[in-house]
Amino acid sequence: MADTALVDHSPHHPTKAPRLETASNVILIDNYDSFTWNVYQYLVLEGATVTVIRNDEISLEELIAKKPTQLVVSPGPGHPKSDAGISNAAIQYFAGKIPIFGVCMGQQCIIHSFGGKVDVTGEILHGKTSVLKHDGRGAYEGLPPSVIITRYHSLAGTHSTIPECLEVSSFAQLGEDADKTVIMGVRHKQFAVEGVQFHPESILTEHGQTMFRNFLKLTAGTWEGNGKDVAQGGNFTAAAPNPPKATKKVSILEKIYDHRRAAVAKQKTIPSQRPSDLQAAYELSVAPPQISFPDRLRQSAYPLSLMAEIKRASPSKGLIAEHACAPAQARQYAKAGASVISVLTEPEWFKGSIDDLRAVRASLEGLTNRPAILRKEFIFDEYQILEARLAGADTVLLIVKMLDTELLTRLYLYSQSLGMEPLVEVNTPDEMKIAVDLGAQVIGVNNRDLTSFEVDLGTTSRLMDQVPESTIVCALSGISGPKDVEAYKKDGVKAILVGEALMRAPDTAAFVAELLGGQSKKLPLQSRNSPLVKICGTRTEEGARAAIEAGADLIGIILVEGRKRTVPDDVALQISKVVKSTPRPTPYPTEVPQGDTDATSVDYFDHSATTLRHPTRALLVGVFLNQPLSYVLAQQQKLGLDVVQLHGSEPLEWSRLIPVPVIRKFGLDEFGIARRAYHTLPLLDSGAGGSGELLDQMRVKQILKSDDGLRVILAGGLDPLNVTEIIKQLDESGYKIVGVDVSSGVETNGVQDLDKIRSFVQAAKSAF
């Protein structure tokens, strides 16, 4: 606007209106903005009785107790998600109860509170006047179609994320582009909740007093209660700069798709996340190892394979499990028998991220037959597929409905080039034909129409006759119980995807067993009759032989210079010969796995503990303390060590560089005890070992309870007289002790006592 067009619209020598009894207790939340008091002035001039409260000086309970007649949320600096104090909680509580009006950040809080997103507009405006187009309803009732407004903002609600419960009530042109607009007003379709992005209280805004007056006329929490019909009408759409866009009904899929396109385009410009950055990382072979998605789907302990989904929210159900921990959920699914874990990585509607997938992949490290990992996302670019592979995905989702045939084919072939067979999703006969013609090995039939988000569980069955026999068909969406699954078994469906029902299940394993018609596949607890017993500090052939004949599983020799129990290499070699030539008194039975054991996932420590038990003889353990890796490797070869024990502060990574199982000692407050796929088993001990100092049993309990899959060897002050009692004190966590380690507890005057060795082994074996 030219300067000559600037008009001061502020009240000149104003006369305060009589007290408005229906606005006798208006609460104005101050988001620390100087305009708050201009808003206050306009409200008071209309007869309202107003109390101003800063956003961080009142709790929601205190605000509720004040029983406001109307709520006004002021402008303010920052972002509504992080800088609005009580504003969002107040809007969420009072919506539908009393009228609410938001100004600038106040409107952004409304959008954020109902699930929309506030982001940068590309403009930074400070005292800029614009032409407003509005729908003539709510705050705009009685105003001319075009109004001059004043804007102070760089953030605004984004068109693609405005939730279904809100409608855009006004807009302004974005910059010089007549085809692009910025949201200037929103209104709830049911509740008397309205916001404006501009400043009606500014002296350069036309009809600002009228807007506040219209708001203060409202007394009920809903439009119906106020006798108002605020459904958008023809006047607003006719005033829009691009009428077809304003009137078109946009599906949820289109909204999500548009939002993801914008987000991915922006992400691709960030240094370290550019396509060239991802490709360079991939060429360095840093992507985690992968498994075959189709092959894993063919392995299941149940009649149908389970694709278990990690799903915090959805457009149709809203929040499902907002605070769910993705890696913890993944471990539950794996133990319950899932063949595939689907990780939703879309952040706005489903509340997921690629970081969830990365954490899930890490959490499954070391499982004997881990589930395949699916990136469940709205994929339209090779970039997203490469990103998924680098994060640890074994497969990705390609939705036929949102991709033309050329793009679908390109993405399918690119995914295959990275070793990932995609899951191709269809919903109609035409889409199924496209997937079959593509040659997809795995086709998912979505029972939910992504245009309307309505569920029809019969969709999968109706499309089965189009599918080649060799193709794996998965039923997706809406499955909540055993009855939903029965028809799929009869129709030849090979897998089902379950999300919400699993996320809400109190017992994941029991729910899966009931759903799929099998027995709950809970992992067996370590046998309490066969703990590993390690006799450490062995210095003679006689001591080694006595320990083995008593039933010990592990014979430890100290290979650390300067320790009183250290043995020289020549003695170590003699002990090694004894260990390898002396048979167990009773061989352990060698069990051949039966049935479908390879179709299930066994936690790392349950599996690794079995590698420390030889069926016919004991194993020789060499104990090292902060010595060079090269020395450890040389001694392992020279002495024929079966196991290496690292008893100092050696890096965890060494465990992967040593060619035999590794026991690693941990103090009670040391990080990394439960880290999978490195050390074979952690050993809990105090100090440098051999001190005879008992561990704090309460702290041991806490450690064991912190991780269901943790298994440890217990050391520290054990002897023949206390080992049984100490194990019993651990109560229900005792089964996680898969072995015990003793040194000074079987000595007399610093020398190994053969009778004590025999007594300790007997006591330890009977303690479980």
Swiss-Prot record:
Induction: By tryptophan starvation. Pathway: Amino-acid biosynthesis; L-tryptophan biosynthesis; L-tryptophan from chorismate: step 1/5; Amino-acid biosynthesis; L-tryptophan biosynthesis; L-tryptophan from chorismate: step 3/5; Amino-acid biosynthesis; L-tryptophan biosynthesis; L-tryptophan from chorismate: step 4/5. Residues 25-225 form the Glutamine amidotransferase type-1 domain. One of its GO terms (biological process) is L-tryptophan biosynthetic process. The active site is at 104 (nucleophile), 199 (for gatase activity), 201 (for gatase activity). Keywords: Amino-acid biosynthesis, Aromatic amino acid biosynthesis, Decarboxylase, Glutamine amidotransferase, Isomerase, Lyase, Multifunctional enzyme, Tryptophan biosynthesis. Residues 252-516 are annotated as: Indole-3-glycerol phosphate synthase. Residues 532-768 are annotated as: N-(5'-phosphoribosyl)anthranilate isomerase. It catalyses: N-(5-phospho-beta-D-ribosyl)anthranilate = 1-(2-carboxyphenylamino)-1-deoxy-D-ribulose 5-phosphate; 1-(2-carboxyphenylamino)-1-deoxy-D-ribulose 5-phosphate + H(+) = (1S,2R)-1-C-(indol-3-yl)glycerol 3-phosphate + CO2 + H2O; chorismate + L-glutamine = anthranilate + pyruvate + L-glutamate + H(+). Its EC number is 4.1.3.27, 4.1.1.48, 5.3.1.24. PROSITE patterns: GATASE_TYPE_1, IGPS. GO terms for molecular function: anthranilate synthase activity; indole-3-glycerol-phosphate synthase activity; phosphoribosylanthranilate isomerase activity. L-glutamine binds at residues 76-78, 108, 154-155. SUPFAM superfamilies: Class I glutamine amidotransferase-like, Ribulose-phoshate binding barrel. InterPro entries: Aldolase_TIM (IPR013785), Anth_synth/Amidotransfase (IPR050472), Anthranilate_synth_II (IPR016302), Class_I_gatase-like (IPR029062), GATASE (IPR017926), Indole-3-glycerol_P_synth_dom (IPR013798), Indole-3-GlycerolPSynthase_CS (IPR001468), PRAI_dom (IPR001240). NCBIfam families: PRK00278.2-4 (NF001377), trpG_papA (TIGR00566). HAMAP family: PRAI (MF_00135). Trifunctional enzyme bearing the Gln amidotransferase (GATase) domain of anthranilate synthase, indole-glycerolphosphate synthase, and phosphoribosylanthranilate isomerase activities. This is Multifunctional tryptophan biosynthesis protein. It comes from Emericella nidulans (strain FGSC A4 / ATCC 38163 / CBS 112.46 / NRRL 194 / M139) (Aspergillus nidulans). The lineage of its organism: Eukaryota, Fungi, Dikarya, Ascomycota, Pezizomycotina. The gene is trpC.
